[in-house]
Amino acid sequence: MGHIMRPLKQYLPCLALPLFVAIADEPCRAQDASDVAKVIVPFVEKHCVDCHGEKKQKGDLSLHLFKDEAAILKGRKTWNRVLEQLATGEMPPSKRPKPAFNEAERFTEAVKSVFVRFDRTAKRDPGLVTMRRLNKVEYVSTIRDLLGVSIPLAEDFPADQMGHGFDNIGDILTLSPLQLERYLASAESIVKAAIVTGDVRDLPKQSFGGSQQFEGTKYGQKYDDRGRIARDDKGKQIPEKERLPALSGDSSRLFYDKGPLHKRYNDLLVAGDYRIIAKLQGHFVGDEAPKFALLADGKEVLQGVCTEKAEEYSATVRLKAGPVDLGVSLLNEFTDPADPTKRRGIILHSLTILGPTVKESQEILFAGSEKLEGDAKTRFVLERFATRAYRRPVTKDELERLMRFVQQAGKISHYRLSAESFQKLHAAKLPGDVAGRLKPMEKDPFTDEDRFVKSIRQRIKDDEFKNHFPTILDAAEKSPQPWETRIGLAVRAVLCSPSFLFRVELDSRPTEREAHPIGDYQLASRLSYFLWNTMPDQELFDLAARQQLHQNLPAQVKRMVADPRSKALFDSFAMQWLGLRRLQEFTPDPKLMPDFSRLQARGNWTDLRNDMLTETGLFFTELVRENHSILDLIDARFTYINRRLSLLYDIGDTNGNSGLPKARPINPAGKPIPDIQILERGQDSGTFARSVNPFVRVNLENTRRGGLFTQASVLTITSHPTRTSPVKRGHWMLERILGTPPPPPPPNVPSLEGQKDAARLPLRQQLESHRKNPNCAGCHARIDPLGFAFENFDLLGRFRETDGDTPIDASTEMSNGRKVNGPEEMKAIVRGEKELFSRNLTEKMLVYATGRGLDYYDVRTVNGIVAELQKGDYRFHALITAIVQSDAFRMRRGKEQP
């Protein structure tokens, strides 16, 4: 052990001490519980409690209550922090007497021995499972896979709270009155979207446009609905009196300008999936074919390339009931420099909307019931649906209650749902004081004919009915509703059930102290929400039904990460782990934005921000699917860029024609990708659609980039809106990558922005002035060098040699005296910290996978996962497989602590 402490700073890793590794894996001399009283407590009282005791708690650290092993074990994170600061020499502070080397070494071994002894002898503890509500993302994706309904259901939902860095933590995913209200309203909307029971019609073909002919011209530019000036093909403005009206019928219209040609259609009778067909023909000028986007209510639903002949292009899109605005937009406008009268354009012959088409949701819901009739059909549909919705076999009692929804529909007009009726209906108690805070609805939100709980009378005797439900407005008998409508009532009841809204893990041994495996259905849910953020698919259900999922976890991991739905690991895990959601709130100084119009590329900050996230998402998703090393996150020789990013990075050519050697698109096997195969992300999870501004996989050899640290998404969230921030970048690397965040800054220390006298100095000198404060120097010695190494990248990720008139200095010196120059050398140092990085990533992913924070007893589990990761050459599949095979993931225990 002496090599760790002698001398205190010289032999330490340059970033931080991997304390978990040292505690867990290094041999320690024999210790016993008496060392707490003989060694640990006296050392703390002598060197620590004056600043971290009952009277003072500097840095929010108090050590005076740690009097025995049990207290020390529960404060494991605190003691890791104590040992780290002792080893680095940060504590005791310079003004306090330092402990002798032998004294500090004995104290360190005594603390470590407490944890080593526990890790080697304690019973396995998978942690306590908390029943948790589906968060917004899980809810929407589950509805999508359960019913095929893809509408933004969660827009009006309150934001999910975060704990331990993620929004899927069970302890905070409770049910508030507002959320309950939203779920009830959403259930009604979902059923209306999933089951079409009204009249369905195909809207007739409606063409709009009109070829406009002028003397000496073939076409004049359109004068669209937004009032753009109409010009003839010689560029001259057309006088109002000479403009010809658009012709009706099947005539066409040629347009050149950026604005879309659009048409407001009549109200759609029902929401649903509609087919939009555009008949288009290209007007060719220049080397490229005209490229178009098909629009529905202002959103792109299809992109494509026109030919010289008129052809039909179609897309199926979900539309809401009511009016809809359809249009076509030219994406690559071009004017011949030699002849301004020649402009690229598109001829729109017709635009047609048909629908709703046969709904996927009804195919999903009613699949297999085509040959059944009556109650047999109803029972089959409900049993299959409820089993999938509850992620487990539906019980006999549950099924009978659902059957009564269908059989008794129409007996009661409607009632206002109350907290009491919700609890009575689902035989469930609302958590906390939710029921007490719910107010009776003053206005019934449901229609008289369509009650999702009409069978409530069947669960209560008639004499009790009036007493239990005084809010019933009308009990008039009504004629039976259509079968689809009555099925819809039961579906709504399922979607409001706690068994659907919560991830409930039923256990036949809920109070058993010993750890035991969870059921296969529960394991299927844990696996699918971890890797896909949605419900299990049929293969997982089948394995669970045969009780074979526990034995097939490695094969399922391999299958599931190859599935497009595994993109959820980026969208929900990596986005939160890396802090990338903050990019949605970031707005740079407009003066610092690139002029894309000057660079002949379309886009604004929103477009560029989305491009940044797409690059990181495609990069991370490939690492997972193709089983790369986790170390490639730090430095890799490829990334994904589109035209805007190629111009921003000056990195290669996706029609950006930038200055560096052209970076040709390659696939994961290293082979070039033909342009026709270049793909861009689509709207659904994990799929990619053809695009005129495609993302391509490019080789980064001989460039200045590679890995997360040089991607615009990371460089931007670690900057200020007006400048870079070495402090934010260094802090991000310590916290997000290495898992060794510095403590919060001391109170009453002015921020860098608050130091007016230093504002006129270059950034490096401003920080040097800031570090003169002794309260700041220690932490900034760790933070700042990491950020300074990346100063060549500006706040948007562009490479630069100067900051204004000041040359960039990317050289720096680590806290251990090691000199580093630039991003490549710093990435090599960070990549060398395999233990720190792999342990931090393991801990973060385990928190996300289990939906709970880690505790002192989880260190043994983490150690085992890290060991498997090392054996697997640090590959992603090794990490994920080790997590799903760990006790924390596939086992549970009762509420009492073992």
What residues fall within each predicted segment?
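Intrinsic low-complexity/disordered segments
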Residues: P7-L8, E26-C28
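Intrinsically disordered/low-complexity terminal segments and short unstructured peptides
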Residues: H3-I4, A22, F446, R860
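A detector of low-complexity, intrinsically disordered, Ser/Thr/Gly/Pro/Ala-rich segments
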Residues: G2-H3, V21, S314, S685
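Bacterial N-terminal signal peptides
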Residues: Y11-D25
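N-terminal secretory signal peptides that target proteins for export/translocation
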Residues: M1-Q10
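Low-complexity, glycine/serine/threonine/alanine-rich intrinsically disordered linker
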Residues: C28-G59, K74-P898
